[in-house]
Amino acid sequence: MHLVPDGFRFPVGNILSLWNSWYFGDRVSGISPLRQLGGSDVVRRDKTNLCRARRVFDEIEDIAIQDGLLRAGERMRSVGIRRSNEIAKVAYTKLYRRLYDIDENEDIARYRIGEITYNAIYDKISRQNR
């Protein structure tokens, strides 16, 4: 069984645009949820992006669980697209504030966090964990 069509390239983009593909896939394009992909499902040069995306999305889901945005035993993939997107925005904003040391009372809109790629967030997480 192929999780992605031949010639598939792992997407590079911002977190919120990739969110639904990560958890729900794209049936029209024949792409399974990206979270299900393994190293053998992507070309060599995309393996790094797959690993980086996994780390970032796991971090966001962990925040959602810790903050009670997901109920006990609930996983992001089981809540449906609409609720998943709402949870993602809240949890990602919290992660962004933590990584960039932004006060909770400061207006986050000026930071244009929706434009930040998962690679940039991964780099920030990695530097913080050193």
Where are these predicted regions, by residue range?
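Intrinsically disordered, low-complexity regulatory segments of eukaryotic
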Residues: 1-66, 70-72
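Charged, low-complexity regulatory segments of eukaryotic nuclear chromatin/transcription proteins
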Residues: 59, 63-130
